[in-house]
């Protein structure tokens, strides 16, 4: 919701479609109400984009309802901390699916649309690694590589819109925020504090301005 709020503040009466696999809860409904108070036409659609048909139906329904789709922010992700040797195939699949299968499905479902941007929320773990998160790091590394792949398709005129993969650090607020235990451990081991909302918004703007496939925050 952090970036949806920024769009609502900066754009005039934007249409914002937020999606997720889970049913809308009370906190999310409150944030939707806030987006609407900011002037946005905001709604939530429950969908699992790791299912090819569901992703296709989502994009079809959006373009049917609103005639156009200007951009995509793919921020799906799931963490199941454990050492790789201890993880089951099911756990690996659950972690990889949102950032791998989900990304491919959404990209292919929008391949015919003249998007302005296609932004991928990756993680610093794909660059620096993270204990107990080998599968998560791999999923994010896929996103980084996919950004370059999609930009090549844009150059070849098979896709539209700038693709950018952003390697985010720990967050202070929002849906990707770290819990207090991880926050304290990271501070102790690295001296790094979680990123605040204002920093993330500026990082997104600057990342888009750089015109690169990938930026590390």
Model segments located where?
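4′-phosphopantetheine-dependent carrier domains
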Residues: 1-217
């Amino acid at each position: 919701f952090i970036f949806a709020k920024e769009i609502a503040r900066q754009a005039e009466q934007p249409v914002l479609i937020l999606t997720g696999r889970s049913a809308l809860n009370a906190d999310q409904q409150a944030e939707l109400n806030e987006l609407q108070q900011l002037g946005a036409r905001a709604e939530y659609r429950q969908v699992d984009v790791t299912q090819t048909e569901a992703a296709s139906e989502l994009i079809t329904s959006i373009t049917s309802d609103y005639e156009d789709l200007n951009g995509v922010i793919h921020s799906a992700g799931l963490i199941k901390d454990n050492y790789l040797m201890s993880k089951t195939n099911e756990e690996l699949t659950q972690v990889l699916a949102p950032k791998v299968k989900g990304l491919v499905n959404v990209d292919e479902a929008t391949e015919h649309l003249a998007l302005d941007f296609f932004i991928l929320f990756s993680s610093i773990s794909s660059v620096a690694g993270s204990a107990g998160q080998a599968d998560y790091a791999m999923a994010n590394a896929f996103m980084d590589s996919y950004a370059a792949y999609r930009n090549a398709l844009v150059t070849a005129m098979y896709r539209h819109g700038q693709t950018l993969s952003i390697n985010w650090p720990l967050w202070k607020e929002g849906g990707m925020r770290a819990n207090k235990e991880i926050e304290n451990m990271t501070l102790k081991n690295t001296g790094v504090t979680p990123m605040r909302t204002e920093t993330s918004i500026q990082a997104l703007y600057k990342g888009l301005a750089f015109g690169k496939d990938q930026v590390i925050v």
